[in-house]
């Protein structure tokens, strides 16, 4: 196994981050035009499997899309984005066996020659998470690079803050914004303390903002270092739901994969407890995959703001009656997840901030009478 110094030298992609500031308005129009609106076309497909072996389940989940994935990848670089919201809590993070099954799948379709695994944990150095979760031997076995997104070139997104609604610049890794990369979200099935459920989209959107090199959360945080991920939260329930929605025009997976072998319920994304769901699901329409994910968790999809916003914008299929599930029947694997204790506050997005102002009166003001 590589030691940490050798690992950094041999595997992590470094480089000076170069911030770019394109015309976000024009870019947004272009991104919207590029998104295929599935709600007016054929049904979306989601693969659903069950089993007792993580790697085998991951491999079988992706098999129904072998031809489509191989064609879409072409000569693109494949970016596998695990979920390491914490560097030390395994239940909150993508399992190395799951990643091995996904790598084995790409090997089976002859697309393993240009694959990287790329992540930026929320709480500290990426190398610590790769080491703790035993990703280094997996990367060595399949001869793929482990990348620290905090050391990649950056672009800027502007997201809102509920406090003043002024756009805030957020540094995000260009690796996850570059449409010349084939981005795969390898997410865990978890509840969330702000947006009820965190699945394939959120793994990409909140994983993309970078941290300063050396940043760690808590009391040991070096002076002057910052982490841009909290900016996505928008200082409130309305802010985070809107930011996830608008970011999806720029940051979204080409292939969505959710590991529900054992999910997290309650106070996710790090403080919850395990649910023995024993499922994996995947598809090319990330919104359809996330929709089936919340169904399997027994969560009312109407309560999840950002997913409904994305559905209204035509980013994917959200109507469960228009999603064809390949493999297992969804109804046979629904396990209601305990919701976070903050659930009532999380529904604030469903009500307006204030009542709309009364329209101005159309009756002209009365002129004062002249004294007779």
Per-range role (PLM):
Residues 1-372:
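N-terminal and secondary-structure boundary signal
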């Amino acid at each position: 196994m590589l030691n940490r110094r050798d690992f950094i030298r041999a595997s992590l992609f470094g480089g000076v981050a170069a911030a770019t500031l394109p015309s976000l308005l024009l870019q947004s129009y272009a991104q919207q035009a590029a998104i295929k609106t599935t709600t007016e076309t054929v049904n979306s497909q989601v693969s659903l499997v069950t089993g007792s072996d993580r790697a085998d389940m991951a491999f079988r989940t992706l098999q129904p899309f072998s031809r489509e994935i191989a064609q879409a990848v072409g000569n693109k670089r494949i970016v596998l984005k695990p979920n390491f919201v914490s560097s030390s809590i395994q239940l909150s993070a993508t399992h190395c066996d799951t990643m091995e099954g996904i790598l084995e799948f790409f090997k089976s379709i002859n697309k393993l020659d240009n694959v990287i695994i790329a992540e930026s944990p929320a709480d500290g150095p990426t190398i610590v998470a790769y080491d703790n979760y035993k990703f280094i031997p997996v990367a060595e076995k399949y001869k793929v690079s482990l990348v620290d997104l905090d050391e990649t070139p950056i672009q800027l997104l502007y997201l809102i803050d509920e406090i003043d609604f002024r756009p805030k610049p957020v540094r995000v890794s260009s690796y996850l914004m570059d449409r010349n990369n084939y981005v795969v979200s390898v997410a865990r099935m978890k509840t969330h303390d702000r947006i009820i459920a965190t699945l394939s989209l959120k793994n990409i959107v909140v994983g993309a903002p970078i941290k300063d090199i050396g940043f760690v959360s808590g009391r040991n945080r070096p002076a002057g270092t910052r982490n841009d991920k909290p900016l996505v939260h928008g200082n409130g329930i309305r802010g985070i739901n809107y930011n996830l929605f608008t970011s999806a025009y720029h940051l979204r997976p080409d292939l969505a994969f959710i590991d529900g072998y054992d999910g997290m319920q309650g106070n996710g994304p790090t403080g919850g407890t395990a649910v023995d769901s024993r499922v994996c699901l995947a598809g090319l329409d990330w919104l359809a995959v996330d929709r089936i994910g919340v169904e399997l968790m027994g969560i009312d999809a109407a309560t999840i703001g950002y997913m409904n916003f994305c559905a209204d914008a035509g980013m994917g299929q959200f109507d469960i009656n228009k999603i064809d599930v390949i493999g297992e029947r969804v109804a046979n694997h629904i396990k209601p997840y305990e919701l976070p204790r903050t659930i009532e506050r999380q529904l604030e997005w469903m009500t307006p901030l204030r009542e709309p102002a009364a329209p101005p009166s159309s009756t002209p003001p009365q002129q004062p009478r002249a004294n007779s």
